[in-house]
């Protein structure tokens, strides 16, 4: 009976899609073609979900999800994005018989905060596997906010995440990923290009971010030293997966908090996360480690601030391992006036040669992203 009901529902959806796309002058042959094309589209979506390539999760935003301005904390959104990605990638990597594994977050591509999310709204997070290599999974995530009083929905975030499957028997062993079926050959080729690009950038970033932020006494306003900040956090069980390693989303939220402190100290106004450049996870963080999350201003444009955030882990209960770099990223913040509109920020004053070099590198990233946005903007009539 359930199979019959499901078949009838599938037929009805296909019929409605087909008839909604017809024009009055179409003939029966056109009707048949449109109907069966719609049926194939519906079945493709259903099969895609059945195979486990999509997952959707949602929850209402509570007061404890808010930042000081009253909107949903950017770190909370990043954490939800990572949770959805971890679910779908771990499920996929265990979809075939073999050694069991857990998917570990390796990298988050640039994430833009397109629209603020408010307390009381429902966050809908949808994740889809879009590419698999031999040892990694690409997951694309979309975040929608819904006002349940008015029914209004809007897109707030888009992100791309990369995961690697680690064996439950030996977490240092990376397992092979079951391949996915692509609808078009072009999809696989485009995914392979994205994979090679992120792999190269991850290797370059790991060696570039080698220095540690050092505190300076009595710094001058608007300098790097004036606003640089750090948080020290002891990793506990609530921060970790069932296997004793820190959730990537926990690390990202702490990174966002430090970046927000740096931005607020620099401009002394309300600030919000505008975007996050690629977050690279260089190494795993175990339960019991003490992590130091350090942030420093690297560049300012007229209305935006770029903050570099570094995460260093110290295995205090393991004398055999030294302090190491666990993650790094660049966050972009904007300053808001009382009406919630972007306003100019104080210009950063780099003092040392390293600070001047980082400023020029940040300027290059800013101009590159600005040109990319302008290139995607459609000309107005």
Curated annotation (Swiss-Prot):
Its EC number is 3.1.2.2. This is Cytosolic acyl coenzyme A thioester hydrolase. PANTHER family: ACYL COENZYME A THIOESTER HYDROLASE, CYTOSOLIC ACYL COENZYME A THIOESTER HYDROLASE. It is an enzyme of class 3 (hydrolase). It comes from Mus musculus (Mouse). Pathway: Lipid metabolism; fatty acid metabolism. Both HotDog ACOT-type hydrolase domains are required for efficient activity. It catalyses: hexadecanoyl-CoA + H2O = hexadecanoate + CoA + H(+); dodecanoyl-CoA + H2O = dodecanoate + CoA + H(+); tetradecanoyl-CoA + H2O = tetradecanoate + CoA + H(+); decanoyl-CoA + H2O = decanoate + CoA + H(+). Residues 354-364 have a biased composition (Basic and acidic residues). Keywords: Acetylation, Cytoplasm, Fatty acid metabolism, Hydrolase, Lipid metabolism, Repeat, Serine esterase. The modification N6-acetyllysine is found at residues 169, 199, 284. The keyword Acetylation applies. Widely expressed with highest levels in brain. High levels also found in thymus, large intestine and testis. Negligible in muscle and adipose tissue. In the central and peripheral nervous systems, displays a predominantly neuronal localization with highest expression in cell bodies and neurites. Coiled coil: none annotated. Homohexamer. GO terms for molecular function: carboxylic ester hydrolase activity; identical protein binding; long-chain fatty acyl-CoA hydrolase activity. Induction: Up-Regulated in activated macrophages. Residues 51-169, 225-339 form the HotDog ACOT-type domain. GO terms for cellular component: cytoplasm; cytosol; mitochondrial matrix; neuron projection; neuronal cell body. The active site is at residues 67, 256. One of its GO terms (biological process) is fatty acid catabolic process. Residues 342-381 are annotated as: Disordered. Changing residue 67 to A: Dramatic reduction in catalytic activity. The keyword Signal does not apply. Catalyzes the hydrolysis of acyl-CoAs into free fatty acids and coenzyme A (CoASH), regulating their respective intracellular levels. Preferentially hydrolyzes palmitoyl-CoA, but has a broad specificity acting on other fatty acyl-CoAs with chain-lengths of C8-C18. May play an important physiological function in brain.
């Amino acid at each position: 009976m359930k199979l019959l009901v499901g078949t009838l529902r599938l037929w009805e959806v296909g019929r409605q899609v087909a008839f909604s796309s017809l024009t009055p002058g179409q003939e029966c042959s056109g009707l048949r073609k449109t109907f069966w094309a719609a049926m194939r589209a519906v079945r493709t979506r259903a099969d895609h979900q059945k195979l486990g390539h999509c997952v959707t999760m949602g929850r209402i935003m509570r007061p404890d999800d808010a930042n000081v301005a009253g909107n949903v904390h950017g770190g909370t959104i990043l954490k939800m994005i990572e949770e959805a990605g971890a679910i779908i990638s771990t499920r996929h990597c265990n979809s075939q018989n073999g050694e069991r594994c857990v998917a570990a977050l390796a990298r988050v591509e640039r994430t833009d905060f397109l629209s603020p999310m408010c307390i009381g709204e429902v966050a809908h997070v949808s994740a889809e596997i879009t590419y698999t290599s031999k040892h990694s999974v690409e997951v694309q995530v979309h975040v929608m906010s819904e006002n349940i009083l008015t029914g209004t929905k809007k897109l707030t975030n888009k992100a791309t995440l990369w995961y690697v499957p680690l064996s439950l028997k030996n977490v240092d062993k990376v397992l092979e990923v079951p391949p996915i079926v692509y609808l078009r050959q072009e999809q696989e080729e485009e995914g392979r290009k994205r994979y090679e690009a992120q792999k190269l950038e991850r290797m370059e970033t790991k060696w570039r971010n080698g220095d540690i932020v050092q505190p300076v006494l009595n710094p001058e306003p608007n300098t790097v030293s004036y606003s640089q900040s750090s948080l020290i956090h002891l990793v506990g069980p609530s921060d970790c997966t069932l296997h004793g390693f820190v959730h990537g989303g926990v690390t990202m939220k702490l990174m966002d908090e430090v970046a927000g402190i740096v931005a607020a100290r620099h401009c002394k106004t309300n600030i919000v996360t505008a975007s996050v450049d690629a977050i690279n996870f260089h190494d795993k963080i175990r339960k019991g480690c003490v992590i130091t999350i350090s942030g420093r201003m690297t560049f300012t444009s007229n209305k935006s601030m770029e903050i570099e955030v570094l995460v260093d882990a110290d295995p205090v209960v393991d004398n055999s391992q030294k302090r190491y770099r666990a993650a790094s990223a660049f966050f972009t913040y904007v300053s808001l006036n009382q009406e919630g509109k972007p306003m100019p920020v104080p210009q950063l004053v780099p003092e040392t040669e390293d600070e001047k070099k980082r400023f020029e590198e940040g300027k290059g990233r800013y101009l590159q992203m600005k040109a990319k946005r302008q290139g995607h903007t459609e000309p107005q009539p």
